[in-house]
Amino acid sequence: MAKEKIRIRLKAYDHRILDQSAEKIVETAKRSGAKVSGPIPLPTERTVYTILRAVHKYKDSREQFEMRTHKRLIDIINPTPQTVDSLMRLDLPSGVDIEIKL
């Protein structure tokens, strides 16, 4: 028998709200009777931007800024219709990007 699985991928710049959102999803899925695997931390994506501090010259004087994208993966195995319904009603912060695969 093939097992059904919902894979949820979360992305955010702030790891605290990402972990809170992941905890809400896991708690909601467990309450509805589904088996949950995760949250699994995925590698953090780090983007570095280098700009010149001065406008015209002084090429040796530069400043670097970085942007970190934190990611988590949650698998919900054998979800019930109640699980899917409760996940659809879940209210998550606006800074979290959610990608769901069935």
UniProtKB/Swiss-Prot annotation:
The keyword Iron does not apply. GO terms for biological process: translation. It comes from the Bacteria. GO terms for molecular function: structural constituent of ribosome; tRNA binding. Keywords: Ribonucleoprotein, Ribosomal protein. Involved in the binding of tRNA to the ribosomes. PANTHER family: 30S RIBOSOMAL PROTEIN S10 FAMILY MEMBER. Part of the 30S ribosomal subunit. Belongs to the universal ribosomal protein uS10 family. This is Small ribosomal subunit protein uS10. It comes from Geobacillus kaustophilus (strain HTA426).
